[in-house]
A protein has these predicted regions:
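Cyclic nucleotide-binding regulatory module and flanking cytosolic helices
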Residues: 1-52, 96-97, 102
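Short aromatic/basic micro-patch
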Residues: 47, 90, 121, 197, ...
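Cyclic-nucleotide recognition modules
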Residues: 89-154
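Phosphate-/nucleic-acid-contacting segments
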Residues: 177-260
Length: 260
């Protein structure tokens, strides 16, 4: 089903200025000099607000826009021939949505808002022209894409080689540390807790498991005193023990940050 762009609402009030953007240090324009930010802002068509469950990209459809995620959570997924969803990645603020090896071709995945999201929208044709003429931005795009693929590979390895308990523990730690990293940059991080809007269905579709299996495994991790999920918050009580279960290291999901 084609994307309904009428579901994209212009962000109320003034659009965020690139020079004061709180996620720019994580995003595509990270390395752009302050004096050059005016032209990057001119590339952006608009800041849009998109409601939960709405799609930003559709598998098999050429996209009109690529996006920088300003706030909220987005799932990248593919749909099997029998209609099942397989989530390959969860995008968080600062992430780029809509990377294509060949710009303008149909997407090989869909992207759906899991929460209300705000995005900076860039027309695909205009952004492609800028990337062709700006090697630094092209390099940054490749770095971001490689990092996303690194996270996806770790998850796929888990699906093929780890138990349900190990897989789920790994996913919790992946998202916990990615969200914490963003929070530290934006001075909004709590000690051992993050906002966690994912449903058991989302977790099942990311892990290749049933919702019943997710519920049982989550209860096991909770009963062992490793974590809890309450009121859309994930709290980790014993990170070393959870990391041992998951065979997890932070370096598996975080990249060196040149501005820190």
């Amino acid at each position: 089903m084609p994307i309904n762009y009428d579901n994209f609402y212009v962000k109320p009030g003034a659009a965020t200025q690139c020079h004061s953007c709180p996620v720019r240090s994580l995003a595509l324009f990270q390395g752009v000099k302050p004096e050059d930010l005016e032209w990057t802002q001119n590339v952006r068509e608009q800041q849009y607000v998109i409601k939960p469950k709405r799609r930003l990209l559709e598998e098999g459809e050429p996209p009109r826009y690529s996006f920088t995620l300003f706030s909220g959570w987005v799932a990248f997924y593919q749909t099997s021939v029998d209609g099942n969803r397989m989530i390959s990645h969860f995008a968080l603020p600062g992430d780029f949505i809509g990377f294509q090896a060949v710009p303008g071709h149909p997407m090989d995945y869909s992207a759906q808002a899991l929460t209300e999201v705000t995005v900076c929208a860039f027309p695909v044709t205009q952004l492609d022209e800028i990337l062709k003429n700006t090697p630094e931005l092209s390099s940054r795009m490749m770095t971001m894409h490689a990092h996303t693929m690194k996270i996806c590979r770790q998850r796929m390895m888990g699906i093929g080689r780890k138990s349900a308990k190990q897989r789920l523990a790994f996913l919790f730690l992946e998202l916990y540390h990615r969200v914490k990293f963003i929070g530290e940059l934006m001075q909004g991080s709590e000690e051992n807790s993050i906002v966690f809007p994912l449903s058991q269905e989302d977790l099942a579709d990311a892990m290749g498991l049933t919702s019943v299996h997710i519920s049982r495994t989550l209860r096991e991790l909770t009963d062992e005193g490793l974590l809890s999920i309450k009121h859309r918050r994930l709290t980790i009580y014993n990170e070393p023990a959870l990391a041992e279960v998951a065979h997890f290291e932070k370096s598996m999901v975080l990249q060196d940050h040149p501005l820190l």
